[in-house]
A protein has these predicted regions:
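Structural detector of coil-to-beta-strand junctions
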Residues: 43-45
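Metal-dependent DNA phosphodiester-chemistry modules and their immediately adjacent helices/loops
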Residues: 251-253, 295-312
Length: 312
């Protein structure tokens, strides 16, 4: 077990003892986390998996990526080794965490990959990370029609923001979709937050403020017990018609923040199962003061309460 793997296991258990939402993050873990709450990611364009023989196999080539334009790499190819500058790692002899870092870290942008096709042919390609859109983690909308009524539907997979590589954020994207739906003459709006585990609380604040006219939207409680009232940062509303918000047991944190305020202001009807129940806010900070830190901690910094005083 490498030092990084040991630290990850030990400190994760240590942190969770004090707070279930605080966790240790390696550089690769941090990149994975920000990728999950971003609509844009730096990527070579290779989606890979580890098979039962601990071999890394290419599952998919992302269109528009560096791997795609080689016209050489195909699904089913096996990654044998990777090389970055003078560092070379043979997959069979290397820590999987190091290989993950090469794929996920923003530090490694130009890497040589040696792969083997099913035919046995071995070849090497030089790949460069490009900023690619994560279409699975981006807002989209369409119109549902029945009995001459038109309902706009907006799916929000996460509260993504302009983190490490992001060029867009959820509040702006939702505003664009609402504008388009309004132009098409909708009679009502459905916001789908099912399976949305949260993301940027700043984006949750902006999105919440976009659907109420003005007023307080939450009460924050910091580590010292100091409370502050958070007011609507966006004056006015982007939509005034009837609304429905869909949630389930996997809707958490920022999703609950938005949903609670819509309910407290009688702004929307909430439909679905009981949500996850996570009313805390985290931030990611480095554990060292190095210029390029390798270890981080995602730590709880505040609790948030509804304007009614409830936590959920």
């Amino acid at each position: 077990m490498s030092e990084i793997e040991f630290n990850s296991k030990f400190f994760s258990v240590f942190c969770s003892y004090f707070d279930p939402h605080t966790m240790y993050l390696s550089e690769s873990d941090k990149s994975d986390f920000f990728s999950s709450v971003s609509a844009n990611n730096l990527s070579f364009g290779l989606n890979v998996s580890v098979n039962e023989k601990d071999e890394i196999i290419v599952d998919e080539i992302i269109p528009g990526s560096s791997a795609y334009f080689t016209e050489k790499v195909t699904a089913g190819d096996q990654v044998l080794k990777v090389k970055y500058k003078d560092e070379e790692y043979v997959i069979a002899c290397s820590s999987i965490s190091k290989v993950e870092a090469l794929f996920n870290s923003t530090e490694y942008k130009n890497v040589d990959f040696t792969l083997r096709k099913k035919s046995g042919e071995i070849y090497t390609v030089s790949l460069t990370k490009k900023l690619l859109k994560n279409y699975e983690n981006k807002v989209y909308s369409y119109i549902l029609e029945k009995d001459n009524k038109r309902a706009g539907y907006i799916r929000i997979p996460s509260f993504y923001g302009k983190f490490e590589n992001g060029k867009t954020n959820v509040s702006e994207d939702v505003a664009k979709e609402v504008y388009k739906l309004n132009e098409d003459g909708i009679d009502g709006l459905i916001i789908d937050l099912e399976n949305n585990g949260g993301g940027s609380m700043e984006e949750a604040l902006k999105l919440t403020g976009s659907f109420i006219d003005a007023g307080p939207i939450a009460v924050m409680n910091d580590k010292n017990g100091k409370k502050k009232t958070v007011k609507d940062p966006i004056k006015g509303s982007i939509y005034f018609g009837p609304m429905v918000v869909l949630i389930n047991g996997f809707s958490a944190s920022a999703s609950e923040f938005f949903t609670n305020t819509m309910q407290d202001y009688n702004r929307a009807i909430i439909i679905g199962n009981q949500s996850h129940g996570k009313a805390t806010m985290q931030t990611v900070v480095p554990l060292t003061s190095d210029r390029n830190p390798k270890e981080f901690i995602k730590i709880t910094i505040e609790e948030f309460y509804r304007i009614t005083g409830k936590s959920n």
